[in-house]
Amino acid sequence: HPVKARVAIYRAYQEYGVRHFVVDHSAELTKLIDVIPPSRNIVVIVRLAIEHGGAIYELSSKFGADIGAAVELVRAADQLGYATGLAFHVGSQCVDAQAYRLGLEMVNNVVEQTSVAPACIDVGGGFPGDYVNSPIPTIVPFLELIDQTYREMQMPTDCELLCEPGRALCMHGESLVLQVHLRKNDMIYLNDGMYGAMIEEKLGLRMPVRVVESRPFSDMVQAFKVFGPTCDALDVYPALLDLPSDIREGAWIEFQRIG
């Protein structure tokens, strides 16, 4: 994260032993200088903004420096006496492996312009999960392309290649089980919604859904509009859900792959 409070930087360094800090602007580098004495044991990682349409949710409009600014930050951090690294994030649920190649090519561009050997390169997260409306059978092609591109860059042998897998690693490890509090004709009201654990549904991802009950339900299905528990009419599931036509108060519904 390239934006941190000074007290957070201080505590991370002094109390928790953090030695890697991300920046994307000179003002954030100034914070580090004020709080942490320069040392080659401290790695200042410069985050690049990457423009690519392969993710359902981009992050570079909020975070990241362009190549010119990144070059200046790397040079400044190196001259101050910090070790340096480079990072990017392709965005959430990236379905195009070429985005990682583009990011690594941008990293290589910065390295060539600065002639500063990076201590690490972080390709971020964004590795896709397998959803009902976004099937990704395996992330192996993503990893293979990252490995191939990184080898072509011929970085120093002591440069660490890092990544931050999220949903691709843990999505199958958690389900959200919600209870029906009320059925009103073709509408049902659940005990969590868009302002809670269901927020990612707003991104258009559709988790597998099933009713988990010991009692039998009808084999006939019906499309329901699903609301969360708040008073806000925007707290509504963005798609109709096909559920047993006789579903009623007290039933439990499992939303899978929510990790």
What does each model-found stretch correspond to?
Residues 1-120, 145:
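Active-site-proximal beta-alpha core segment in soluble small-molecule metabolic enzymes
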Residues 26, 49-51, 89, 124, ...:
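Anionic group-transfer/hydrolysis microenvironments
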Residues 55-58, 96-98, 131-134, 172-174, ...:
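Short, well-ordered secondary-structure micro-motifs
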Residues 90-92, 121-131, 163-168:
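Glycine-rich beta-strand-to-loop/alpha-helix junction loops that act as flexible
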Residues 96-112, 138-147, 176-184, 242:
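Short, electropositive alpha-helical surface patch
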Residues 145, 160-259:
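Charged (often Lys/Glu-rich) extended helix/loop segments that serve as interaction or gating elements
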